[in-house]
């Protein structure tokens, strides 16, 4: 009877979440800086991201924010032990200057509306469901225009079944999610996500397994895009690839980590072979986390009856400061070299970001980004700027 009730609740939650898409992401800046060394301490996912655990909820009120109760519904109601729920809502306002007669452009829109549910079948097996409404600037800015397009933007980026008998140790999961790889930022616009197969709404179906230890972890995934026969809410965007991804991480003294990674993806139009590394270093005296990622990419494009290949490089190097509780401010430099053999094909970006957590469940964000192509920003056509304000509420 208990199992049948769980299955019924899972079905009802799936229908509910389908009516709420965005991206189930994490904040890699909180590793080490919050006193937490493993991303899976705060998230149910063994690689971090998505619905947060009871530990993560405690941290959101006691460490990350200025105060408040981080529990679901602010502690007004506690779900049963076999059920975990959550939601993310983001509202954004932006100014985008990319050149041309219509620049700059201004927009205000709902960036993310996601709901999460996790059902535990005993102590070892769980079902995870996520669903929401794709963020969209849209051409019709009226309220009626916004609401009339909601039905066309249903999406479920993550849904999987997982065997994970303990917080550390082996695990296996199967379903739709991003195969563990890279720094895994909230900001999908960063080059290290856009050009390695981890762009927005590009989650794949995977069979993934690995091991999470106290000071190391390993994740290996076989991935493939959603079948074209699947309904629209289960489809992905971007390059369709199938292949293998692997990520390994070693942590040192609760203050640093080094990770190695590889991703081999093949498709009918484009194939990519990626190898790289990530790293973090926490400096307690100055309350600063340095973090970076660098990847070499071999991209092969099908042209007629043949192929054309090019070598690429993509990187991120940043520093995030935590001057006071509830506030973090970061600066970063990004580089994407579209073809290492051709001069002037480099894309550069400088990012300034401030995140303020005044109370548990609430985040205010300001992001400034300047991009330029080539060795300098000598012309307007070769540069672009973005400024964005965000209000984030998580349940």
Residue ranges and their predicted role:
Residues 83-89, 127-129, 170-172, 218-220, ...:
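Transmembrane beta-strands of outer-membrane beta-barrel proteins
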Residues 79-81, 119-123, 165-167, 212-217, ...:
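Outer-membrane beta-barrel strand-turn architecture
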Residues 81, 102-111, 152-157, 201-205, ...:
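Residues that define the transmembrane beta-barrel architecture of outer-membrane proteins
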Residues 36-46:
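The canonical Cys-X-X-Cys-His
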Residues 47-51, 84-93, 102-227, 249-255:
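Outer membrane beta-barrel
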Residues 38, 356, 382-395:
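Outer-membrane beta-barrel "beta-signal"
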């Amino acid at each position: 009877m208990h199992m049948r009730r769980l299955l019924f609740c899972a079905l009802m939650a799936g229908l509910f979440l389908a009516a709420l898409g965005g991206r189930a992401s994490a904040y890699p800046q909180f590793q080490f800086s919050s006193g937490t060394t493993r991303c899976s301490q705060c998230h149910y996912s063994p690689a971090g991201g998505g619905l947060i655990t009871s530990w993560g909820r405690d941290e959101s009120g006691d460490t990350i924010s200025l105060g408040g109760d981080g529990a679901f519904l602010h502690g007004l109601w506690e779900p049963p032990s076999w059920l975990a729920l959550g939601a993310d809502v983001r509202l954004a306002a932006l100014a985008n200057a990319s050149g041309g007669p219509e620049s700059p452009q201004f927009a205000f829109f709902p960036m993310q509306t996601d709901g999460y549910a996790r059902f535990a079948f005993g102590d070892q097996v769980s079902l995870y469901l996520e669903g929401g409404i794709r963020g969209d600037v849209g051409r019709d800015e009226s309220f009626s225009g916004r609401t009339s397009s909601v039905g066309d933007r249903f999406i479920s980026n993550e849904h999987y079944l997982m065997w994970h008998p303990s917080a550390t140790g082996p695990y296996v999961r199967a379903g739709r999610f991003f195969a563990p790889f890279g720094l895994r930022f909230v900001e999908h616009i960063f080059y290290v996500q856009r050009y390695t197969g981890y762009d927005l709404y590009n989650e794949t179906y995977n069979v993934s397994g690995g091991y999470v230890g106290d000071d190391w972890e390993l994740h290996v995934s076989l991935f493939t895009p959603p079948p074209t026969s699947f309904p629209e809410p289960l489809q992905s965007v971007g390059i369709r690839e199938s292949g293998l991804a692997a990520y390994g991480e070693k942590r040192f003294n609760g203050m640093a980590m080094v990770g190695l990674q590889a991703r081999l993806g093949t498709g009918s139009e484009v194939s990519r072979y990626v190898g790289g590394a990530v790293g973090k270093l926490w400096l307690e005296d100055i309350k600063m986390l340095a973090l970076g990622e660098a990847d070499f990419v071999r991209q092969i494009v099908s042209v007629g009856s043949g192929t054309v290949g090019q070598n690429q490089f993509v990187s991120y190097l940043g520093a995030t400061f935590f001057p006071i509780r509830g506030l973090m401010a970061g600066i970063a430099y990004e580089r994407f070299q579209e073809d290492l053999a051709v001069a002037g094909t480099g894309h550069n970006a400088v990012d300034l970001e401030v995140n303020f957590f005044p109370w548990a469940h609430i985040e205010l964000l300001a992001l400034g980004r300047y991009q330029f192509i080539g060795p300098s920003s000598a012309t307007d056509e070769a540069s672009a700027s973005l400024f964005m304000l965000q209000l984030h509420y998580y349940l």
